[in-house]
Swiss-Prot record:
ATP binds at residues 15-20, 72, 239-241. It comes from Glaesserella parasuis serovar 5 (strain SH0165). Catalyzes the ATP-dependent amination of UTP to CTP with either L-glutamine or ammonia as the source of nitrogen. Regulates intracellular CTP levels through interactions with the four ribonucleotide triphosphates. This is CTP synthase. PANTHER family: CTP SYNTHASE, CTP SYNTHASE-RELATED. It comes from the Bacteria. Allosterically activated by GTP, when glutamine is the substrate; GTP has no effect on the reaction when ammonia is the substrate. The allosteric effector GTP functions by stabilizing the protein conformation that binds the tetrahedral intermediate(s) formed during glutamine hydrolysis. Inhibited by the product CTP, via allosteric rather than competitive inhibition. Residues 1-266 are annotated as: Amidoligase domain.
Amino acid sequence: MATNYIFVTGGVVSSLGKGIAAASLASILEARGLDVTIMKLDPYINVDPGTMSPTQHGEVFVTQDGAETDLDLGHYERFIRTKMTKANNFTSGKIYSEVLRKERRGDYLGATIQVIPHITNEIKARVIEGGKGHDVAIVEVGGTVGDIESLPFLEALRQLAVDVGREKTLFMHLTLVPYIPTAGEVKTKPTQHSVKELLSIGIQPDVLICRSDRMIPANERAKIALFCNVPERAVISLKDVDSIYRIPALLKSQGLDDFVCDRFRLTCKEADLSEWEQVLYQQANPTGEVTIGMVGKYVELPDAYKSVNEALKHAGLKNRLTVNVKYIDSQDVETKGVEVLQGVDAILVPGGFGYRGVEGKIRTAQYARENKIPYLGICLGMQIALIEYARNVAGLTQANSSEFDKHCPQPVVGLITEWQDESGNVETRSDESDLGGTMRLGAQQCHLIEGTKAREVYGTETIVERHRHRYEVNNTLLPQIEAAGLKVSGLSADRKLVEIIEVPNHPWFIAAQFHPEFTSTPRDGHPLFEGFVKAAKEHQGKNA
């Protein structure tokens, strides 16, 4: 069957939740037995978000094949079973880079390179390639209609609708329908103007998703349908909800999936959303709560740790617990002391880059170790735990990472210069390598040592987890640290790189070089986070 395309755009304001809406629709279509994928087209000029500040852009989500992508791809994977790849996210920067590379190579035979047709053709080619082999490909365009940066993408999608046929494409537009308290009613004019903006570039939306803080009355939906030239059944009300996992049922109740299937003439079963009903039941019926102290350097923007936050919630569902996250700036630990860590049931130190706040994280790891508080370290959080143990237990008092001190006399963590990827290829890097796209990225196999807490938590000998880092444990100094009691519980497939460490005489102290949060989902959870949240509850019980 040829691929059907749903193009998702946003209007009026940004941050309306296009990614969540797209993922929710995808989950309903998947529940109807369709093979669905989702793509995100980002208009910014960066080649990828890998070198962007987390406090500006939010987290960088890493796919199985090692793409550094927009955090929306994390939402996609949490809502549907399809795994994202490099084909599921591309930016203006990536498109322009490829077109310029082809021009230098002579592919265009001396033609004058222009936005139309060269840039738009490259966008279309990537969308078609990303949708191959799927029944439905949902394509989300970042930004807001009217932004100059989005124009090449919108023009490419307009052309693509003509190329593949309007019967195989559907334009879904998210808009804001604000409620004005003084008038006591919702206002549809912003939506009308947003659709007018789309029409000016040749796109007639087929479905309107109207975001508001309440359900939009039938008479207002009829008004929107009339003025925006869409069927009344295609005007969908999407109100604010207390859980994003309610949205699939909310969209289904208004017949959005039926409209899509009718449009594409797809014959498929009714959607079974029982898995999502189970998620919502677990969420609504907790038997207790725990507080996790997350000690990081980007805590002013929780989206910088989006997948970690979601993984903690998923672990809460599996343990029937509400998980509260207390964000603690690691610099506050440096200036105010470990008192800021009091009152938490467990401590999590997530990934990060750069020296700022590192000493606060080291003091945090020491506090968790000495006070028997459950600790989960992720990426930098593992390196921090290693440095702390080396300094305070193994006698390597000048231990540090060469990331923070290039002339450190005891570099227990150093730049990784060579490793083997999942395909068996050897990757090499040096201090002179570019920052962008040069880390150890993507899914890697990890061997778990028998008799360790990590092996017990996962319940298997071999796991596959995703990486995003350029520094690793220095094997030269490792024997001295192990002799002091630290346990290596996970190794890379070739047994050369340390992937997991743990403190044996501790209720729950595990730190991993990889990012387990990227593979956690609300339906399946993740064993490492589930074990961590369970340990937090047990610690809470001991201190009650």
